């Protein structure tokens, strides 16, 4: 069974292209993970966060920590945090 992780990604500056950032996240996702969709959310002073909806296996060792570490390691990312996790399917 899979879960849907909603991840809020804060860029280092307002000059970071969020579309390119989303593509970089998509490229780096491990096997079994999938970027379902993304959107932007205004934060302050013209800065926007990327909201990434990522499907991943529920029984992943380390849970969402591995995903946060992966995204936090991408150039241009200030930090990323899990906003919500929900189980997919019944």
Swiss-Prot record:
Keywords tagged on the record: Elongation factor, Protein biosynthesis
Protein's UniProt keywords contain Protein biosynthesis: yes
GO molecular function: translation elongation factor activity
Superkingdom in the source lineage: Archaea
Family statement: Belongs to the EF-1-beta/EF-1-delta family.
NCBIfam families, per the entry: aEF-1_beta, PRK00435.1
Name of the protein this chain belongs to: Elongation factor 1-beta
Species annotation: Sulfolobus acidocaldarius (strain ATCC 33909 / DSM 639 / JCM 8929 / NBRC 15157 / NCIMB 11770)
Gene: ef1b
């Amino acid at each position: 069974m899979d879960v849907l992780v909603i991840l809020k990604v804060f860029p280092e500056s307002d000059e970071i292209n969020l579309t390119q950032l989303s593509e970089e996240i998509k490229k780096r996702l491990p096997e079994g993970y999938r970027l379902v969709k993304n959107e932007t959310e205004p934060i302050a002073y013209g800065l926007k966060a990327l909201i990434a909806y990522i499907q991943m296996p529920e029984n992943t060792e380390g849970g969402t920590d591995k995903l946060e570490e992966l995204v936090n390691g991408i150039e241009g990312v200030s930090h990323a945090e899990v906003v919500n996790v929900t189980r997919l399917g019944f």
